[in-house]
Amino acid sequence: MIAEERIREKVYRLKATYALRSVSILGSYAEGRATENSDIDLLVEFEQPTVSLLKLNSLKYDLEDTLGIPIDVIHAPLPAGSMIRPSKIVRIL
């Protein structure tokens, strides 16, 4: 399991590159039940409301390369009626 502070540091280093407005952790990492097999679920809001799939995937792969763990990047804000309903959100940026 990766410490929240390490995730925060890596995300902060990519803030300018990807024009990140906010990043939050969801899922097992946010709920404190992550295991060594868990991925990291990130809810990401960009400075621009519209972001290309290429940019989302680039962010995902940059984070996976630096953290060495699978990452799921979810574009924020979540739309009304979204199937994703996190029980806990931990803002890291």
Model-derived segments and spans:
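Short hydrophobic/aromatic beta-strand micro-patches
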Residues: 43-45
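Catalytic core of pol beta-like nucleotidyltransferases
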Residues: 1-22, 30-36, 47-93
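Structural signature of the urease/amidohydrolase superfamily beta/alpha-barrel
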Residues: 39-41
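Conserved histidines in hydrophobic membrane contexts and catalytic metal-binding motifs
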Residues: 25
